[in-house]
Amino acid sequence: MDNYAFMLAQQWINKIPAETALPLQQQLDKLPNDKISSLGFLPLKDPVIGLVLGLFLGHFGADRFYKGDIGLGILKIILGVLGIVFFIVFFAVGASMSNSINGDSHFLVAFFLGLLALLAPSIWVIADWFFVWKGIKRDNFKKITEYLSMLGARDLRETR
């Protein structure tokens, strides 16, 4: 394997799906050096950045915006805001009903409904830790294969 092709494959190893690394290295071996050198400037996204964004700003859709899924990022923002609004509304309604007979039980029911509305979008946020991680790697591999096909290499997508 050419030294530059090997370095390039090692640079991409954590940015593409694991099952595609070997076929990609084999394809890079077949390319001439002048074509391989242009691959070094291919902008790939880092799945670790997507994960960190999901961990800290997942309710605001930052991981989806980073991945390029703008529509899903906006939907995550809307659901997160709705969860907060419903929590505040249920909490306020429960607090106002706490002065009536059986008020404490009404407050608890309203509080737990509000808490449920606040935590429901969290299920999607947690699932997105995995979906965005895998999706970024798939998108990177797709970008590499499209660029390789522009360079005249055989299509690697059939190896998956």
Per-region residue spans from a language model:
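Short loop/turn motifs that initiate or flank beta-strands
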Residues: 73-75
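Transmembrane helix recognition focused on a "late"/terminal membrane span
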Residues: 1-51, 77-160
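A short amphipathic helical element positioned immediately N-terminal to and/or at the very start
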Residues: 52-65
